[in-house]
Amino acid sequence: MRNFEKAFEYINQAIEHTPTVVDLYVLKAKLYKRAGDLRRAATLYDEARKLDLADRYLNAVASRYKIRNDQVKEAEETMALFSKETDGSLNVHDMQCMWYESECAAAYLRQGNLRLALKNYNFIEKHFDQIYEDQFDFHLYGLRKFALNAYFEMLEMEDRVYRNKYAVRAALGTIKVARRVSKLNKEEESAKLKPEVEEYKNSKEYKQIQDEIRKKDDDDDFKNDPDPRGYDLYENFVSLP
């Protein structure tokens, strides 16, 4: 019926009657989303999250709504409440949290930050490459354990792994970035990017990341990412003919 005026009237009465029910704030946030007010929807989801700080699902949805409202930094801080390492860094990439990467990439693309949009789409691409490569570890295991049903299901899944919605979104998103880059003056973009790259590579953050990578003995591509801000990736992308 899309009678938002009546819907808000009833939901406000319900919240006034029992202001501690989380679901009421969630429903009101959804109403604002349907009405097209993402800013208010994100605020209400954050209010709902604060009523139950132990609810991981609410935390994730509140983060999603913040990203869709282009509040990426605030969303990262919210996600960090449940998804961070001992050093305080987010582990969403290590956990293959593709919805988060996809939403962040789309937000950065809307903001015109092609570097970080490309980096987040690249994270998703790496996840699927890793999933595809991991099948080789399962070949001998599946045959040795005679788990043929699971083995054949795995083979069928790997044949269509790149049809996954996140793989498709990442591919289309990368194409959108490429189209935006193709419209730029590449010489000017490279000249503008060069001092940013030099400043970042001389920063304390970058040097600390490189020192930590040298100390680690695992081969995790996400924990040992030498280019977490996507400067090298974007610089190479811009230099393509």
Could you say what each language-model-derived stretch is?
Residues 19, 53, 87, 129, ...:
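Short coil turns that delineate tetratricopeptide repeat
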Residues 176-240:
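Acidic, serine/threonine- and proline-enriched intrinsically disordered linkers and terminal tails
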Residues 21-23, 55-57, 73, 98, ...:
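Helix-start (N-cap) detector for alpha-helical repeat units in TPR-like alpha-solenoids
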Residues 28, 61-62, 104, 154, ...:
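Structural register within alpha-helical repeat arrays
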